[in-house]
A protein has these predicted regions:
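Small-residue hotspots at the loop-to-helix junctions and early N-terminal turns
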Residues: 47-58, 137, 196, 268-283, ...
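Generic alpha-helical transmembrane segments of integral inner-membrane proteins
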Residues: 24, 28, 32, 36, ...
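Helix-terminus/linker motif at the lipid-water interface of multi-pass membrane proteins
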Residues: 28, 32-50, 120-127, 183-190, ...
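Small-residue-rich hydrophobic transmembrane alpha-helices
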Residues: 50-110, 147-166, 273-337, 370-392
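Residue-level signal for short hydrophobic patches within transmembrane helices
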Residues: 9, 13-32, 36, 59, ...
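Transmembrane helical elements of multi-pass membrane transporters/channels
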Residues: 18-37, 139, 150, 173, ...
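Short alpha-helical transmembrane segments in multi-pass integral membrane proteins
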Residues: 1-20, 78-143, 187-243, 299-366, ...
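Short runs within selected transmembrane alpha-helices of multi-pass transporters and secretion channels
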Residues: 71, 139-158, 166-174, 195-210, ...
């Protein structure tokens, strides 16, 4: 595992894996924030509460993806400057991006509080869970500043090769989240609001810890007065990368949000099944998503250092690693789909169980598709072509949304059509992205 890694030297596969493993572990722990809520809420409160948290999670991901996209885009710029050895440009970029993303966070927070009810009505949230979902989201977005701070500092540390430190603070936060969930729900009987409060408090601990560590232990990232200025070059670079990556994340999650509205129209049982299955699927393919992010950092550092031969070798190594890992995960999810669903739902809830198993087995058979797509996203960001990542996202999500509504309208297909639209969108975007890569690189 790397704490202060120069990704422009050393064996490619070993370097990538050592850098990626803490990020994979961190991504799984990140899912535990919502998994802890989902598991405890589903088992201790009931199916309605599970449906509320699951549907809320989709909206949370869409809105938080704006901040995440800005942080990912900024992190790519940080990696390019770090790989080129330009530390003064790195610090200027850190200042510009922090101010930019901080301002967006404030605007987003105000927008959520003003328009939360119209958004929930647009999503066709059933009345029997409307109040629970609204209360949960209100509390979650009171703590959105913690999400911004943690993601920003984590992106900054990873950009300079430290993938371990964000993991430790996240692990502490997840452990606290689970303890507080149990205390607030089982002991204080605060219900779904208690789960939201636990998540916000845990995220606050993670953000405070990572800020304090960076200030004390990483003086090269500490800003000086001379770094705190908006020079045109830094501002243009950050806005270009961050905006396009933000658009990519937003398009991705807006498409998912539209599909959530379609899922909601099938009733609470399908909503609950989808909520549980999405959490399982997120665990299953989140490692390849983080591998794609680590791969992007690797490519960006080497692109900044002009190590183009190493980039080509890295592409081949990453592709092979992703395919092997994805096949293993696909087999495991297909075989153990029912036991995995039983973690979240009671055995007697047969309709929820059957629907969730169907979702997992259809989507899970094609995890290679999403794994390769994450590599393509990371590659095009790192070589200063973030617009191509947006194009691939539009292809993937556009196909998914269109097919979902088309197939779900066929009585003999119904909700199953929504599940099939997911891998079809992945595979189509993969084909376009790989064809473009071969056209530009001749290999």
């Amino acid at each position: 595992m790397l704490r202060n890694g120069d990704l422009t030297r050393g064996g490619i596969t070993g370097t990538l894996l050592r850098f990626t493993l803490p990020m994979m572990a961190g991504s799984l722990l990140q899912q535990c924030y919502n998994i802890a809520d989902t598991l405890i809420v589903g088992q201790c409160i009931g199916a309605d509460a599970l449906a509320a948290v699951g549907s809320a999670y989709t909206l949370m991901v869409f809105l938080i993806s704006i901040l995440l996209g800005l942080s990912i885009g900024s992190g790519t710029v940080f990696s390019l400057h770090y790989g080129a050895g330009n530390h003064s440009a790195l610090r200027r970029s850190i200042f510009v991006s922090f101010v930019l993303i901080g301002a967006v966070t404030c605007v987003l927070n105000m927008a959520v509080f003003v328009w939360l009810d119209p958004i929930l009505r647009l999503l066709q949230v059933p009345q029997d869970i409307y109040g629970m979902m609204r209360g949960y989201l209100w509390i979650i977005f009171c703590g959105i500043v913690f999400t911004f701070i943690y993601n920003f500092y984590a992106a900054m540390l990873r950009a300079v090769g430290d993938s371990v430190t964000p993991l430790w603070f996240l692990a502490l936060s997840v452990a606290l989240n689970i303890v507080l969930d149990l205390f607030f729900i089982l002991q204080l009987d605060w219900g779904i609001e208690g789960a939201a409060i636990a998540t916000v408090m845990a995220q606050g601990v993670a953000s405070a810890g990572i800020v304090l560590y960076t200030w004390r232990k990483r003086p090269e990232l500490r800003l000086h007065i001379g770094d705190m200025r908006f020079d045109r070059g830094s501002l243009k670079e950050i806005v270009s990368f961050s905006t396009l990556t933000c658009v990519q994340q937003s398009v991705m999650n807006f498409g998912i949000l539209m599909i959530q509205g379609l899922v909601n129209s099938f009733g609470t049982a399908v909503m609950a099944a989808c909520a549980a299955a999405v959490k399982i699927a997120s665990f299953a393919y989140m490692p390849v998503q983080e591998f794609g992010n680590a791969f992007s950092t690797f490519i960006a550092q080497n692109f900044g250092a002009k190590r183009y031969g190493r980039i080509r070798r890295g592409v081949r190594s990453a592709l092979l690693t992703t395919v092997i890992f994805s096949i293993i995960v696909s087999v495991l999810v297909f075989v153990f789909a029912e036991p995995l669903m039983l973690i979240f739902v009671h055995p007697g809830e047969t309709e929820i169980l059957a629907t969730g198993v169907e979702y997992l087995r259809i989507e899970g058979a094609f995890y290679c598709g999403i794994g390769i797509l994450f590599l393509l996203y990371g590659y095009y960001r790192a070589v200063r072509k973030p617009g191509m990542s947006v194009v691939l996202t539009v292809i993937s999500l556009g196909t998914r949304v269109a097919l979902s509504y088309l197939l779900a309208a066929i009585p003999s297909v119904g909700v199953t059509g929504i599940w099939w639209s997911i891998p079809i969108g992945w595979l189509l975007a993969d084909a376009v992205g790989m064809l473009y890569y071969k056209m530009k690189n001749g290999a």
